[in-house]
């Protein structure tokens, strides 16, 4: 609770400060920003957009967002209370100590991601912790429907690796996952669901290599509610090898489902919040904007950070509407929210949907 109270206070203070300040810094290229310290990030942004993301919400943008979470969530006040080192949160340790942390089971595949981003970080002039969170925000700005995220600089880089066991796994049960988020930042069950909005623009690469880059929903390049709709559909078959721990049956050909997502979508503590994101895009954007900021401040003193949010591009608008994939109807839904009926949605016309893998950049 203390962390979230501090975050709320800092957010209000920043908003009040921004409203009262009329003078803005002018960067060497003529761009005006709220803080002069952020001018150097303009070149970093452009380098990432032009040479890594190609201004697209593709594989590299997805991985950049994944990296922000796997770095930041590795913090445990409960471990600290017992005299153990509990990790530093958003401190860049997953890149600084990549030889250790990318060997942790939940970080499988991130060794290649870290190395692909390392040259960008090295020429950016940014600290590693700041770079990881900034690159995730820049990449997500390419996703239609995403909110304009916040970007802050001034974090302290890690001096030791985070301990293993702090990143949730797809085979963990709901109680374990909720406890992990609560320990990391006093996040409750609803806020845990907010983190999973990131799965709207995501795919798996290494859980089942037989179907590498299989997305979690039918619109992986768009941050919309389809992930929340489609995870509530009845699974009918494994799209890959089958029998892999943490993998559930999928409702749509080509779509990958994590067991953890399936269970959280159906748990009575989280099901109604989950269902709400299927049709409420404004809420989805608002909650993800908040939780991304909160995540990026784990392990930091937010009062020491500099707001560089105005460096970030504005995401493209959403052009899709909530729907069932072709071949799916309301009869395929496994409703789990006792408070609100599952919404009535149109079904896409044509033959049954088959979802393509996310193209490799």
Swiss-Prot record:
Its cofactor is Ca(2+); heme b. The record marks 66 as: Transition state stabilizer. The active site is at 70 (proton acceptor). Glycans are attached at residue 268. Depolymerization of lignin. Catalyzes the C(alpha)-C(beta) cleavage of the propyl side chains of lignin. InterPro entries: Ccp1-like, Haem_peroxidase, Haem_peroxidase_sf, Ligninase, Ligninase_C, Peroxidases_AS. The keyword Signal applies. One of its GO terms (molecular function) is metal ion binding. Binds 2 calcium ions per subunit. Binds 1 heme b (iron(II)-protoporphyrin IX) group per subunit. This is Ligninase-3. GO terms for biological process: cellular response to oxidative stress; hydrogen peroxide catabolic process; lignin catabolic process; response to reactive oxygen species. Belongs to the peroxidase family. Ligninase subfamily. Its EC number is 1.11.1.14. Residues 341-361 are annotated as: Disordered. Ca(2+) 2 binds at residues 200, 217, 219, 222, 224. Keywords: Calcium, Glycoprotein, Heme, Hydrogen peroxide, Iron, Lignin degradation, Metal-binding, Oxidoreductase, Peroxidase, Signal. The lineage of its organism: Eukaryota, Fungi, Dikarya, Basidiomycota, Agaricomycotina. It catalyses: 1-(3,4-dimethoxyphenyl)-2-(2-methoxyphenoxy)propane-1,3-diol + H2O2 = 3,4-dimethoxybenzaldehyde + guaiacol + glycolaldehyde + H2O; 2 (3,4-dimethoxyphenyl)methanol + H2O2 = 2 (3,4-dimethoxyphenyl)methanol radical + 2 H2O. Heme b binds at residue 199. Residues 1-20 form the signal peptide. Ca(2+) 1 binds at residues 71, 89, 91, 93. Pathway: Secondary metabolite metabolism; lignin degradation. It comes from Phlebia radiata.
């Amino acid at each position: 609770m203390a962390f979230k109270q501090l975050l709320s206070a800092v957010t209000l203070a920043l908003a009040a400060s921004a409203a009262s300040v009329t003078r803005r810094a002018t960067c060497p290229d003529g761009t005006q920003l709220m803080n002069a310290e952020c001018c150097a990030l303009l070149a970093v942004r452009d380098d990432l957009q032009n040479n890594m993301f190609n201004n697209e919400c593709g594989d590299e943008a997805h991985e950049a967002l994944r990296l922000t979470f796997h770095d930041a969530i590795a913090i445990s006040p409960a471990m600290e209370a017992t005299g153990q080192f509990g990790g530093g949160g958003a401190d860049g340790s997953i890149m600084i100590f990549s030889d250790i942390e990318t060997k942790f089971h939940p970080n499988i595949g991130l060794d290649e991601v870290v190395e692909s981003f390392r040259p960008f970080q090295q020429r950016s002039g940014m600290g590693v912790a700041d770079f990881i969170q900034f690159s995730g925000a820049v990449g997500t700005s390419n996703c239609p429907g995403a909110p304009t995220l916040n970007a802050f600089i001034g974090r302290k880089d890690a001096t030791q690796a985070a301990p293993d066991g702090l990143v949730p796994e797809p085979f963990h049960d709901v109680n374990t996952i909720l406890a992990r988020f609560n320990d990391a930042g006093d996040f409750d069950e609803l806020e845990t669901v907010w983190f999973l909005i990131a799965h709207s623009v995501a795919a798996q690469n290494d859980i089942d290599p037989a179907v590498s880059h299989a997305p979690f929903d039918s619109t992986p390049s768009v941050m919309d509610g389809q992930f929340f709709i489609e995870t509530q559909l009845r699974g009918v078959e494994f799209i890959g090898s089958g029998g892999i721990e943490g993998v559930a049956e999928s409702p749509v050909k080509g779509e990958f489902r994590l067991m953890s997502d399936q269970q959280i979508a159906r748990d009575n503590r989280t099901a109604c919040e989950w269902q709400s994101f299927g049709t409420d895009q404004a809420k989805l954007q608002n909650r993800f904007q908040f939780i991304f900021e909160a995540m990026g401040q784990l392990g930091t003193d937010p009062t020491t950070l500099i707001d560089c949010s105005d460096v970030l591009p504005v995401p493209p608008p959403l052009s899709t509407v909530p729907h069932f994939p072709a071949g799916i109807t309301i009869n395929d839904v496994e409703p789990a929210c006792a408070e609100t009926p599952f919404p009535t949605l149109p079904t896409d016309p044509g033959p049954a949907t088959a979802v393509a893998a996310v193209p490799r950049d």
